[in-house]
Amino acid sequence: TGRYAENVYFGKPSGLMDQMACAIGGMVYIDFENEEKPQVEKIDVDFEKAGLTLCIVDTKGSHAGLTHEYAQIPVEMKQIAAHFGKNVLREVEEKDFYAALPVLCKESGDRAVLRAIHFFAEDERVVKEVNALRAGDWNRFLKLVKESGDSSYKYLQNVYVSRDTVSEPVAIALAV
């Protein structure tokens, strides 16, 4: 339903993670191997007990102008996967991806390759984050979240519009 609303009503080619997390509530682990029936697991955490408060920061940033940028993420990941005869990047062996870097940069461009680098690292990082939460290791979890934000900024490149380098408030928020 969330994806349908995002795709059809709002005309945006996204809509899986945010809506799923909102519907379940709290921290969730989502595996999208089967997009029609993703595996969703609620991770019970107690921020208060850990002495933490979850805050949403108003960066004054906007998603305006980012629809095309977001839409290119799966397109570029699928371009990389297609090089290996696969439909999606999760079907590609990471070692094979790295062995083919020069060719992939020529075929799909550097941004697509950087986004794929993020994908491989993020898939591993998510498992580590979930394990840290289950173990109550908040320092490890927060370190991994910071790594994720840094990777999103540098490799996934989904925090700013590439043609508007004057206004990058989300990038500023990640930096501080």
Walk through the language-model features, giving the residues of each.
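Glycine-rich, mobile lid/loop segments that gate access to catalytic sites or pores
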Residues: 1-19
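C-terminal nucleotide
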Residues: 21, 26-176
